Curated annotation (Swiss-Prot):
This is P protein. The keyword Magnesium does not apply. Contributes to a melanosome-specific anion (chloride) current that modulates melanosomal pH for optimal tyrosinase activity required for melanogenesis and the melanosome maturation. One of the components of the mammalian pigmentary system. May serve as a key control point at which color variation is determined. Major determinant of eye color. Seems to regulate the post-translational processing of tyrosinase, which catalyzes the limiting reaction in melanin synthesis. GO terms for biological process: cell population proliferation; developmental pigmentation; lysosomal lumen pH elevation; melanin biosynthetic process; melanin biosynthetic process from tyrosine; melanocyte differentiation; pigmentation; spermatid development. One of its GO terms (cellular component) is lysosomal membrane. The keyword Membrane applies.
Length: 833
């Protein structure tokens, strides 16, 4: 701000007051700040930068006393390096119209002093100047008040941030304390109850000779669990009763009570089919204990020929009812989902906590498993498949093939983003119909991430879309998804005429209809979502680079001086990149349209930047990967290949490691998603423990009861609707593999019940459709979802439970609705049974 005297005679004295952002420098005023006069006589000998003395005078023209500062006290405050500037001690909260008399006693001089006498015209000009100065003083005062208000707001904001930080620390402390207490409590409960173990007893039964035993010592028990092992089949007998089977009769005497004068004898019959292939199968059944009387068990075989049938029998008394065990299982499952949904802990740790809680619950009810038994619950075939394919993909990424595929996909889409997403989703759905879903996403995820980085897209949204269509496509064939494999492999269903071709024919048509509806629905769900990043690609890549550098620094454990030095260098690199990012954010601003108009020019630039880096390694990788995929496909048709998917993936990884001649093996191991593998191991233990707590069995039995309650003329349609939706909702919450394995015998018993007489195959199609499509409901509903999320997180693009849920759950609802309508038309209207 510049204050000048308009009088020509006083033009020689110019006083400049610069208002800076950090300090406010103002001229001193009289006790009456209503009028301000800053003048300097031309005849004065004052140096430039000094002010006149000021003496009080009752100005007649002005009506009030006006003053100017005396130079001896105010000093040369504009001279650079002057000590007067230090004496003034201006601060950020110093008012612009600062009274110098508050700091020092200033002498005042009347304005009617001879040296200040001027002509009438100049005096009028002075009055005008005074009015302007008064207006200026008021504005400056307003600015000072505004600055003070902003500082108060800033202080309030700082105080609010401090309160939020303190609250965050309290919440974090409560979380850690609560989880630690929970873990300690579960550990104590698990350690208090010993491992009872199962004592198997060998016995032989025949049509002419049965086996009987009396059990006692169950004073505090509520449930009797019987385990039968041998050449058995998990399923009830058909209505004809011609199959060979074993009948287990459990009898107990209920003592006389208040309502009964005589004791009552309770009898339970359990029929188990014999397997002609003599496979070793373990089946279990629970029976309620109604009294403290001894329990009698009798086993007899019903055979077409007289022969002995060897069996193994084990029994165990449990201290909690089935309802109590189911309630505890539901509470544990709800707790695990709460930890994952709200991201209280990492999903791997959440699965481990859930597994520990389930094991503690089993220990309390008297069914604590041994460590060997718990390890047997882990599906090592799935883990071997994941590990082998991760090794293959890690070596494959060294060739630059993923970058090349990304550029080709961009070229085929001609710069249209949604055309490219449509092609990626369609390719993923088709490939997953003939390969395992996990294998499909292990191959597609790196390509998609690199493609999105090239096009400045958000990879999270595209990856979620691919996962959804991978799960949909996997339901089309008998080998696309594990539930389908379990259903087709069942021997009882094979006897009913279920084969690969028939199953695929039924499922393929329904999945095609689901795909046709799911694509428009996905586009509708993405309608208001910005697929492009809001910032330029340079900024996005720089942020991602900072994130990767920081993760790398955090993963280095400072065990030695050299590692500490390397970690320090990485952190310095992070600081340098953050400084560069701040400069880029200040410089670059651009808007990106939803369709790239200059795609042809971009293609040429991308082709120059992203090429195949190692052609010889690419040939080796393609050869091994082609062999592995071929073996995956032939494994389901050629009986001479005695290798499962896990062995094929492991052998392929070993082959490629030999051909690639990689000396630094730790680099490849660093690219393996160990957190994902550990999550699956914990999830397998959790789901198997929940199965032992009778959760899955309870859901199946309640579904069967609901179907029996429906009138007979509507029972078939109601069964299809119930099975589809129960399977879909259950598979979105728990693993669909144990659920499918448990529901198959339940549905077989339901179809073979003479009172219901429902066809079994349509029920199996409904089970397969619901179990496969239900995996899109939540992030942990299918193995494919977890694998994709783990790889994306490894690349710095992880997505949360809710991000997947907002897109996956609506697609799951719509796809299950379309699939249900297809099954109703095919089996109710058309009668394709």
């Amino acid at each position: 701000m510049r204050l000048e005297n308009k009088d020509i005679r006083l033009a020689s004295a110019v006083l400049e007051v610069e208002l800076h952002q950090t300090s406010a420098l103002s001229v001193p005023t009289c006790p009456d700040p209503g009028r301000l006069l800053t003048v300097k006589p031309a005849t004065s000998n004052y140096k430039l930068g000094q002010a006149d003395p000021c003496i009080p005078y009752a100005g007649e023209a002005a009506g009030k006393s006006v003053c100017v500062p005396e130079h001896t006290e105010f000093g040369s405050f504009l001279v650079k390096g002057s000590s007067s500037l230090k004496d003034l001690s201006f601060k950020e909260d110093t008012p612009l119209l600062w009274n110098s008399s508050q700091k020092k006693r200033s002498q005042l001089m009347p304005v009617h002093h001879p040296e200040f006498i001027a002509t009438e015209g100049s005096w009028e000009n002075g009055l005008t100047a005074w009015e302007q100065k008064c207006m200026l003083g008021k504005e400056v005062a307003d600015l000072s008040a505004l600055a003070s208000s902003e500082k108060r707001d800033l202080a309030g904001s700082v105080h609010l941030r401090a309160q939020v930080s303190k609250l965050g620390c309290c919440v974090r402390w409560i979380k850690i304390t609560g989880l630690f207490v929970f873990v300690v409590l579960c550990s104590i409960l698990f350690s208090l109850y010993p491992d009872q173990g199962k004592f198997w007893q060998l016995l032989a039964v025949s049509p002419l000779e049965n086996y009987s035993v009396n059990l006692s010592g169950h004073a505090d028990s509520m449930i009797l669990q019987l385990d039968l092992a041998g050449a058995l089949m998990a399923g009830g007998p058909s209505g004809s009763g011609k199959e060979e089977h074993v009948v287990v009769v459990v009898t107990q005497t209920d003592a006389a009570g208040n309502r009964r004068r005589r004791p009552q004898q309770l009898t339970y019959n359990w029929t188990v089919l014999l397997n002609p292939r003599s496979e070793h199968v373990v089946v279990s059944r629970t029976f309620e204990i109604v009294s403290r009387e001894a329990v009698s068990i009798s086993i007899q075989a019903s055979l077409q020929q007289t022969r002995l049938v060897p069996l193994l029998l084990a029994h165990q008394f449990l201290g909690a009812s089935v309802e109590a065990q189911v309630a505890s299982a539901v509470a544990i499952l709800a707790g695990v989902y709460t930890l994952i949904i709200f991201e209280i802990v990492h999903r791997t740790l959440a699965a481990m906590l859930g597994a520990l809680a389930a094991l503690a619950a089993l220990a309390v009810v008297g069914d604590r498993p041994s460590l060997t038994h718990v390890v047997e619950w882990i599906d090592f075939e799935t883990l071997a498949l994941l590990f082998g394919m991760m090794i293959l993909v890690a070596v494959f990424s060294e060739t630059g093939f993923f970058d090349y595929c990304a550029v080709k996909a961009y070229q085929l889409s001609r710069g249209r983003v949604w055309a490219m997403i449509f092609m990626l989703c369609l390719m993923a759905a088709i490939l997953s119909a003939f390969l395992d879903n996990v294998t499909t996403m292990l191959l597609f995820t790196p390509v998609t991430i690199r493609l999105c980085e090239v096009l400045n897209l958000d990879p999270r949204q595209v990856l979620i879309a691919e996962v959804i269509f991978t799960n949909i496509g996997g339901a089309a064939t008998a080998i696309g998804d594990p539930p389908n494999v379990i259903i087709v492999s069942n021997q009882e269903l094979r006897k009913m005429g279920l084969d690969f071709a028939g199953f695929t024919a039924h499922m393929f048509l329904g999945i095609c209809l689901v795909l046709l509806v799911s694509f428009p629905l996905l586009r509708l769900l993405y309608w208001n979502k910005k697929l492009y990043n809001k910032e330029p690609s340079e900024i996005v890549e720089l942020k991602h680079e900072i994130h990767v550098w920081r993760l790398t620094a955090q993963r280095i454990s400072p065990a030695s001086r050299e590692e500490t030095a390397v970690r320090g260098l990485l952190l310095e690199k992070v600081l340098a990149l953050e400084h560069l990012l701040a400069q880029r954010l200040h410089t670059f601003h651009r808007q990106i349209s939803q369709e790239d108009k200059n795609w042809e020019t971009n293609i040429q630039e991308l082709q120059r930047k992203h090429r195949i880096s190692d052609r010889s390694l690419l040939v080796k990788c393609l050869t091994v990967l082609g062999f592995v995929i071929s073996m995956f496909f032939l494994n389901s048709f050629v009986p001479g290949i005695h290798l499962d998917l896990g062995w094929i993936a492991i052998l392929g990884a070993i082959w490629l490691l030999i051909l690639a001649d990689i000396h630094d093996f730790e680099i490849i191991l660093h690219r393996v998603e160990w957190a994902t593998l550990l999550f699956f191991a914990a999830l397998f233990v959790l789901m198997e423990a929940l199965t032992h707590l009778h959760l899955v069995e309870y859901v199946g039995e309640q579904t069967a009861l609901l179907i029996k309650m429906v009138p007979e003329d509507q029972r078939f349609a109601a069964a299809i609707v119930l099975i589809v939706w129960v399977s879909a909702l259950a598979s979105s919450l728990i693993d669909n593999i144990p659920f499918t394995a448990t529901m198959i015998p339940v549905l077989l018993n339901l179809s073979q019940d003479p009172e219901i007489s429902l066809p079994a195959l349509p029920l199996m199609y409904a089970l397969a459709l619901g179990a496969c499509l239900g995996g899109n409901g939540t992030l942990i509903g299918a193995s494919t979802n977890v694998v994709c999320a783990g790889i994306a997180e490894k690349h710095g693009y992880g997505f949360s439970f809710m991000e997947f849920f907002r897109l996956g759950f609506p697609v799951m609802l719509m796809s299950c609705t379309i699939g249900m309508c297809y099954l109703l038309i095919a089996h109710i209207v058309v009668g394709w049974n």
